[in-house]
């Protein structure tokens, strides 16, 4: 769920999730246009991942995970919730791996700057 996603971003990327809201064309609710940088692409890929989840709502599904040898491992018996966890885990690692691409000019980017056709997932 979105609360757990926020927690994973802090655990894995070491950054507050506030930096990911209203960023670029995809970080936040919804998304259109072309991702503006690698950080925005992390959000695009996360949106695509959520779009492929079936049998539960990824924004509200509560999943389980453990930390093993410094790595986060998604667990539980529900395949849908495990898929949501994987979406969140991969996105948090993407944010971590692309920290240096974050650019304040894309924070609160006006929607008029995201008018291009979206690429397919």
Swiss-Prot record:
Domain of life: Eukaryota
Tissues/organs with expression: Expressed by the venom gland.
GO cellular component: extracellular region
Record-linked Pfam families: Phospholip_A2_1 (PF00068)
SUPFAM superfamilies: Phospholipase A2, PLA2 (SSF48619)
Intracellular or extracellular location(s): Secreted
Cofactor(s) named in the record: Ca(2+)
Disulfide bridges in this chain: 25-114, 27-43, 42-94, 48-121, 49-87, 56-80, 74-85
Catalytic EC class: hydrolase
Keyword list, A-Z: Calcium, Disulfide bond, Hydrolase, Lipid degradation, Lipid metabolism, Metal-binding, Secreted, Toxin
Function: Snake venom phospholipase A2 (PLA2) which exhibits indirect hemolysis, induces mild edema inflammation in the foot pads of mice and slightly delays anticoagulant activities. In mice, not lethal, even at the highest dose, and exhibits low to moderate myotoxicity on muscular fibers. PLA2 catalyzes the calcium-dependent hydrolysis of the 2-acyl groups in 3-sn-phosphoglycerides.
Entry-linked PANTHER family: PHOSPHOLIPASE A2 FAMILY MEMBER, PHOSPHOLIPASE A2, MEMBRANE ASSOCIATED
Name of the protein in its database record: Acidic phospholipase A2 SpII RP4
Species of origin: Bothrops alternatus
